[in-house]
Amino acid sequence: MKWDKLLNDKRRRESGVTRSKNTDVRSAFENDFQRIVMSASFRRLQDKTQVFPLEKSDFVRTRLTHSMEVSTIAKSMGNMVTHTIQEEKLDQDFTKDHADKIPEILACAGLLHDMGNPPFGHFGEESIREWFRDNLATITYKNKSLAEILTPQMKEDFYYFEGNAQVLRVVSKLHYLFDQYGLNLTFATLNAVIKYPVSSLKVNKKQIKSKKLGYFYADESLFNEITTATEALDNRHPLTYLLEVADDIAYLNADLEDGVKKGIVNITQILKGFEEVEEHNKVTAACYNELKKKSERYEGQEESFIVQQWLASNVRGQLINRSLEVFYENYDAIMAGTFNDSLIDASSAEQLVQILQSLSFTYIYQDKGIVESEIAGNEIISKLLETFIPAVIYYDSETPERQTAKDKRLLTLISDNYLGCYRKNAEGESETMKLYLRLLLVTDFICGMTDSYAKDLYQRLNGLS
């Protein structure tokens, strides 16, 4: 792979706006950034759960604040990487133009990476997967089950449903501003946010690039268009490795910080989590010793302040620097598309990551409030699927008369934007493809909901409000 192509700043449709070079000096990627920030889908992230249930408190992260943190960390890592590549002469073909573009692309990808997630955090994704596994074989269309009618790839798209794959749909199709190109972002930005460049038929948890579904069957031509333009093809875009690290660092730090602020975990428990690991490597030892020093130095201060200082001044830096060491050491393999690991897991910070993850799992993810929120979210999403999937089965079919009056009324609740997108993509397609697209219409609708809207709609449809 070559940076000239990987950083392709062209768009699927050339911008229809004529800009004067004297008055608009924005780069294509700065323009991407502005389009994302000003989009409704980005704003909706403020009402989507990160980990803790949404509340009026101003410190608990939402998807919006998480995405902004990922964007900031990713951009910072981009600046560090471009500086080192040039200083250490890791790539003779690397130019200043490449160096200027990379941080901007990563900033955009950080904002985008969670834009396809359904309500109620990652548990919402699992709720969708679980519902389709349980129900595709029982719902019928013309006396045959959907599991019999759909192709293997169509079925696997729902069995392996993934919010990251949904990002492509949101920004390139569902954001129907002027035409079918959505936000019409650059090829480089779109490619950087594709974490898994594989279809649902090629999911392989042993391979870093194919751990999860990367794009839906309905978006295969879009995926091919993007990866052909960047010449990444079925390889992972090099910047995706950096985006992944930024995401990991943001949630590892934020979950622990928010947990301390909410009184779910304290410094004594964090130190104990470190002490339960018998042999510390240098990275782990440095972080452990630093927390002990800070807790002694700031004795009497709020624990949330001490942990916040520790995470910001010590942990985050270790995770970033150790991950980037792996990026530099494996630069050629990454550029060749053969590196099969996450940067953070392959680094000397892996032990630290395992401790932080263990602390979060033990104290935070098992918290009663989080568990209750996840169970409620599962109930809401499952019920919405149970309600809307049967309602769309005979919509735009060869036998529309089989739609009930209730089905037709339910369809009026789906926005004209989603229905218009469906009609555009279903035009001229086979009956099976249309049926598949109608199922996607419902998942598109649900993934576009905020937590509050999903909860409110569920309550109204079930006579609870």
Curated annotation (Swiss-Prot):
<dbReference type="Pfam" id="PF01966">
    <property type="entry name" value="HD"/>
</dbReference>
<keyword id="KW-0378">Hydrolase</keyword>
<dbReference type="GO" id="GO:0008832">
    <property type="term" value="F:dGTPase activity"/>
</dbReference>
<dbReference type="InterPro" id="IPR023024">
    <property type="entry name" value="dNTPase_3"/>
</dbReference>
<dbReference type="InterPro" id="IPR006674">
    <property type="entry name" value="HD_domain"/>
</dbReference>
<protein>
    <recommendedName>
        <fullName>Deoxyguanosinetriphosphate triphosphohydrolase-like protein</fullName>
    </recommendedName>
</protein>
<dbReference type="InterPro" id="IPR003607">
    <property type="entry name" value="HD/PDEase_dom"/>
</dbReference>
<dbReference type="InterPro" id="IPR023293">
    <property type="entry name" value="dGTP_triP_hydro_central_sf"/>
</dbReference>
<feature type="region of interest" description="Disordered">
    <location>
        <begin position="1"/>
        <end position="22"/>
    </location>
</feature>
<dbReference type="InterPro" id="IPR006261">
    <property type="entry name" value="dGTPase"/>
</dbReference>
<comment type="similarity">
    <text>Belongs to the dGTPase family. Type 3 subfamily.</text>
</comment>
<dbReference type="InterPro" id="IPR027432">
    <property type="entry name" value="dGTP_triphosphohydrolase_C"/>
</dbReference>
<dbReference type="InterPro" id="IPR050135">
    <property type="entry name" value="dGTPase-like"/>
</dbReference>
<feature type="domain" description="HD">
    <location>
        <begin position="63"/>
        <end position="252"/>
    </location>
</feature>
<dbReference type="GO" id="GO:0006203">
    <property type="term" value="P:dGTP catabolic process"/>
</dbReference>
